C-alpha cells in the first residue's frame, strides 16, 4: 500500500459518496403537480375536517423590528409574510430574504387560533374572526426592547378575544398570547392550535438551488416529542401524523432557515399533519381543550420561531430545536466541528481563516496516524522483493500464498491495512465539514479574502480548485510508488485532474480546507521521510524501490 494507491481509495470513497448523494436526490420527495391555492383558512388541526370556506379579506398589518418584518392578516391573525432584514436574498442584494410569503405562486404561512366546540376559528362556527387593530403598522422604537401588537375580536356571544404578538429586539421568536374574557352566559370550550402551511412545489423564485452539487438538503416538516428528539416528516408522506406529547415543537425546514411552533410546556399537545389542498402541506399542534367559565378569563400561549437556524438561540427557546440544522448522517461530527469553528471565529472574526486553523488542528491531532500510515507503507515497500520472490516460488497456489504472506507480515510486524486507517478516518471528517458548510447559516454569504465572497458557494473563478489540483500533483510526485501496472499508472496521472473537475462545484470553504490539508500533508510527509531515512526505510535518491 503506498500514497498513490491511497489516492485510488480516496477516489473510491469519494465516488461512492457521490453515487449515494445522487440516489438520495433522485429519490427525494417529488412534488405533485402544482395547483395554486391562496387562503388564510386553517385546517384547524383535524385532517378529516375541511377548511373554512373563503371569506372576506382582512386588513394587513405590518410589524417591523431590527431583524424582522412581518405582515399579519387581521382575518384570523395569521402571519402571512416574514422578511429577515439581516439576511439578503442573494449575495450583495439589498433585498431581505423572505421566509413567509402569500402570493398566487407560493403560500407559506404561520397560522394560529382557537378551535374547539366554541372556538372562533372552528369551521362550524362560521368564518374566521376578523380582529381589530389600533394601528396599520408597528415599529420597534430605538431604545425599546419589546414590541406588542394587540388584536381584539368580540364574538356574537359577547366573549372578548385578545391576540397579542410580542417581539423582542434582535430575536426571531414571536410570542403569541391569547387572553379570553368570557362575558357570555355559557362556558366556552376552546383549543389553541398553531400550524405552518406551505406549498409543496417550489416556484422558480423560491428555488435557491439547495440541491447543491452532490448534496441534498432537507426541505419539509419536522417535530420533536417526548419519544423523538428530532424526527423529519416528508411533505409527500401519505400517512398523516398524530402524536400526543408534552412539550416539543413542530417545524418546517429548508436550507439555513426554519419556522417552528413551540406550544406551552404545561399540559399535553397533539401534533398533526394535513393536506388542505393538492399542493399544500401543513404541520401543527393542538393543545388540551380548556373550559372558560362565564365571567372568567383564560390565557393561552405559544411561541413561533421564524428566522435563520441559529443553534444557540433555538436551543434556548426549546429543547432539541437546534437539531433542525441539517448536518445529515454525520451530524455527530459536524456539530462539534461547528462549535470549534465558531469558537475560533470568535477570536479571529473571519470564517475562512477559522477553517484554515481548524484544518491545522485536525491534521495535528491525526499526525500520529499519518506517521503510522507512512511507516506502514515504507515497510510494505521494503517487503516487495520478498513478496515478489514468494510469488515466483509459490506460483498459482492462492491459499498457500495468502498464508505465507500473512506469516511474513506477522514476522515483520507489518499491518497491510495500516496505510488505509487514516484515510478511513479523514473521509468522514471531510464529509462532515461539507455538511457543516452547507447547513450552517453563519457561513451563508460569509467572505474570506480577495475574490472569495461566499465560503458556502463555489469559487466563481475556479482558482481554489486548480490550486487544490496542483497540491495533489505535488503530493503524488513526492510520494514513492510500487505501482507497476500501466493502467493504474495512467489513472494516477490523471487523478489530480479528475479531483480538480469534481471540486469545481464544491463550496469554496471546503476546497480551502482541502488545499490547506494537502499543504500540511506535504510538510508532514517531509518530516516523516527524514525519520524513515534514519531507520533505513526510505531513500530520497529513488522513487521506486
Curated annotation (Swiss-Prot):
It comes from the Bacteria. Gene3D superfamilies: 2.70.98.90. GO terms for molecular function: membrane insertase activity. GO terms for biological process: protein insertion into membrane; protein transport. Its main location: membrane. InterPro entries: Membr_insert_YidC (IPR019998), Membr_insert_YidC_N (IPR028053), YidC/ALB3/OXA1/COX18 (IPR001708), YidC/Oxa/ALB_C (IPR028055), YidC_ALB_C (IPR047196), YidC_periplasmic_sf (IPR038221). It is a multi-pass membrane protein. Keywords: Cell inner membrane, Cell membrane, Chaperone, Membrane, Protein transport, Transmembrane, Transmembrane helix, Transport. GO terms for cellular component: plasma membrane. The chain crosses the membrane at residues 6-26, 342-362, 417-437, 455-475, 496-516. Residues 31-54 are annotated as: Disordered. It is found in: Cell inner membrane. Interacts with the Sec translocase complex via SecD. Specifically interacts with transmembrane segments of nascent integral membrane proteins during membrane integration. Belongs to the OXA1/ALB3/YidC family. Type 1 subfamily. NCBIfam families: PRK01318.1-1, PRK01318.1-3, yidC_nterm, yidC_oxa1_cterm. Required for the insertion and/or proper folding and/or complex formation of integral membrane proteins into the membrane. Involved in integration of membrane proteins that insert both dependently and independently of the Sec translocase complex, as well as at least some lipoproteins. Aids folding of multispanning membrane proteins. This is Membrane protein insertase YidC. It comes from Serratia proteamaculans (strain 568). The gene is yidC.
